[in-house]
Amino acid sequence: MIIQNYWNSVWRNLMKRKGFSFINIFGLAVGMASALLIFTYVAFEFSFDKMHSKSERIYRVQSTFHEGEVLTDDWATSSFGYGSAMQENLAGIEDYTRVGCIIQPEQLVKYGELCLRENGIAYADPGFFRLFDFELLKGDRASCLSMPCQVVITERIARKYFRDEDPVGKILIFNSNMGKVSCEVTGVMKEMPSNSHIHYNFLLSYATLPKWVQEYWYKHEAYTYVLLDSPERKEEIERAFPQLAEKYKTEEALKNKTWGVRLEPLEKIHLNPQLGYEAELKGNHSAIIALIFGAIAILIIAWINYINLTVARSMERAKEVGVRRVVGAFPKQLVGQFLFEAFVMNLIAFIIALGLIELLLPSFNQLVGRTITFSVWFTEYWGGGVLLLFIVGIYISGYYPARALLRKKPIVLLKGKFQNSRSGENTRKILVIVQYTASMILLCSTLIVFAQLSYMRRQSLGVKTDQILVIKFPGPTEGMKTKMESMRRAIKKLPLASKVTCSGAVPSEEVAMFLSNHRAHDALKQNRLYEMLSCDPDYIDAYGLEVVVGRGFSEEYGDDVNKLVINETAARMLGYVDNDDAIGEEIAVETLGEPMQVIGVVKDYHQQALNKGYTGVMLFHKDKIEWIPQRYISVVMKPGDPSELVSQIGEIWNNYFADSSFDYFFLDQFYDRQYRQDEAFGVLMGGFTGLAIFISCLGLWVLVMFSCAVRTKEMGIRKVLGASRWNLFYQLGKGFFIPIIIAILIALPVAWGSMNAWLAHYPFRTELKVWFFLLPVVLMLLISFLTVAGQTIKVVYSKPARSLKYE
């Protein structure tokens, strides 16, 4: 009966002021949708790698190198020999697995007549399926990777190569720069979940690798995972490892460094900082935290909006509450009525919010590059968190308006004088201050995020990226070197091709090949790691690298195969104070018997995006270290139709490598993909900032409307007494602009401090300028002015006689 009475009251109030109810519910729904969408994304990001039953005890072994107390290198990868040596010599390691990626990123995979270029290929030992719970649809978890020349493939790959046939027992041929190997399919696994940092299409048995590689300590090209008997063992193992490493440092390379490890918890890998040689781009922890605060701010703004509008409207309901109290209604019953009304309003808003999320989720997934569903709500505590937020929202938005009315005596409520309460007015002003403080912080932050993105895009990269077509090398074939040179010359003759060069890496990616080098005549042999870029003599000119001292490679010099060109960072790492000092110096390069001579220094350029710092790079002739493979042909295009050039190169390709797929990309687009994460963050911040301002202004608009309604007669009297229109406008507006100005004064230092800390993560960043804060202030005041003016003008320009008849 009580619930029925509550429902009747709620329905009557909803229908009585439909416009008001729509604004209230819509503002709440938009705020909920925004916050829940962000919370869904956050839940997904925090769910990474938690699907494994032993995830809390699994750690990734990451390599660290120190010179004294200085950390010089920090990698996600580790040596091939770390896993077995750690289990044999260090206490607390129950099990381990290694995932080796020594071979080139792409290989040719053949089954019958079908031959395709594939990536996502790795070498895993039997421990892989002991540590990780990836679902194996076919095959035995204990033995599918136990012998040489075995391979486990994903369900998608099985359909791709074998259609409806049973793939188990079939033979796949893998062709890489280390030769051909035939592997028997011993298992089929389900696609690795999107919320896993591990994604492979082919897992070859670790025993397939050459024997010398399997326990080699001087190749840090494996991802090693250990299962600890207790998380408390982590620090103990990290402390003991440097002493263990001394037993295995038998070669000259990196002998002067302290070899260490950092055990990174599996569940934290995705949101911890991006390290060198990560398999995938990780999440951005600072951006996630910023989005959490943004979502909470939007939710608070929506709740405050609801409270302010409900309290503002309570002047109409004061007599209703007064009558109920006079006829015997208990305070608890009245609070229950308001809470029930808040429950209904929040429930309607929640349902609308779910509908909005369902509509927006596909576009949102495309923006953030994820595959997110509502299923994340049902993992661990996230579903409970959403429910708790819903309950808190009901309490906040229902309890305060009820208490605001119950504090007044029934006689005051029956007289309808509730609106004159100074304490209630002050409370609403405080809530407006909170709303606009949050909106102002979001607005300043969004502007600075876009300013940083613009800064990174406007800066000179020091390397050419536009008008360059990049073609991936084919899989290893007979007479590869001769064919590639013939094809390069053929492409160079095309009318739309300006320059053609071959290299082991292109701008936008890690060079990914590094060697431990030092000055040849350095008695201390201070080895440091340098990225080694294999290229032909045309590379420096084609990519527009600036030679600041010396010269680049040239076919005119017959001995350039034994020369090096280094960048400025490499020169400093070698200890040269002046770039000129490096010219003619000899460098001892790891794996080479004879030193190489420096013939030139190029200006530092951005091999990767500006969210990463400069690294020491050594460019060497492609014929010098042949085990470091060539991977790309870069074609600098002349003005014209790119598709025509692609078509012409495709024809040339088929003349030489008909069995390999012709894969290409445009370098500027490939380079820009590095900024997608930052751009997505900027778009999200911008979108939610706009919503926060919209909701705040929506609430302000209704508050002004009610204020004008209450003060209509007062304004009429002021007009009769000679007040000007500007004076009337001032009287009506000052009560709203003072809280907004206070909010701005609070928000500015908070925004400056938080965004200064955010920018500190970028090695190349914009400076905080005054207009980053002045422009949001002007925008906020202008939007607020228009919101207030829209309502107050009606009262200011109304006739006094009409105003005096009001009420």
Predicted regions and their residues:
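Small-residue-rich transmembrane alpha-helices
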Residues: 33, 37-40, 262, 266, ...
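Mid-to-C-terminal secondary-structure elements
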Residues: 125-137, 149-283, 486-677
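Intracellular coupling helices
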Residues: 5-23, 27, 302-345, 407-418, ...
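Alpha-helical transmembrane segments
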Residues: 30-59, 360-369, 438-466, 483, ...
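C-terminal transmembrane helical bundles of large multi-pass transporters
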Residues: 658-745, 755, 760, 797
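Membrane-helix entry/capping segments
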Residues: 1-12, 16-20, 52, 242-295, ...
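Membrane-proximal extracellular/periplasmic loop immediately following the first transmembrane helix
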Residues: 38-105, 219-225, 238-240, 260-271, ...
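Hydrophobic alpha-helical transmembrane segments of multi-pass inner-membrane transport and secretion
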Residues: 16-44, 282-319, 347, 427-452, ...
